[in-house]
Amino acid sequence: MQLTELIETTVTGLGYELVDLERTGRGMLCIYIDQPAGISLEDCEKVTRQLQHVLTVENIDYERLEVSSPGLDRPLKKLADFERFAGSEVSVTLKKPLDGRKTYRGILHAPNGETIGLEFEGKKGEAAMLDFTLADIDKARLIPQVDFRSRK
């Protein structure tokens, strides 16, 4: 079983989603998990303990294991991510430029089959629509929406 498959099986078995996995040159393994209700420190501890056990049993070499939430600027990688975050503001970087640009920022529309829509501000300030597929994307991330106004 490949490392990604092993980790994804473990994480999903605990009721979480594997968002991303990074392996650094210094032996550090970074795992990013999520669930609809968000991720707590206890969730990270639970996944860390289980992964330490699984990686030891499977004899996977690593120096350090880090499990965390994907953060406010969560990457979008799967079609399910684009469905879940429809209506959110996102930044999408395409592999190949379209109309002379690769990076777009706008409001995500729910996928229609394999096609994903992004409503963005066009050259003349009018609303424009970009249609793309997962294969067209280099990277896509949520744009954090933080409200610093205090509640009264």
Swiss-Prot record:
Keywords tagged on the record: Cytoplasm, Ribosome biogenesis
Location(s), subcellular: Cytoplasm
SUPFAM superfamilies named among the record's database cross-references: YhbC-like, C-terminal domain, YhbC-like, N-terminal domain
Gene Ontology cellular-component annotations: cytosol
Gene Ontology biological process terms from the UniProt entry: ribosomal small subunit assembly; translation
HAMAP family on file: RimP
Biological role stated in the UniProt entry: Required for maturation of 30S ribosomal subunits.
PANTHER family listed in its UniProt record: RIBOSOME MATURATION FACTOR RIMP
Name this protein carries in UniProt: Ribosome maturation factor RimP
Gene name tied to this protein: rimP
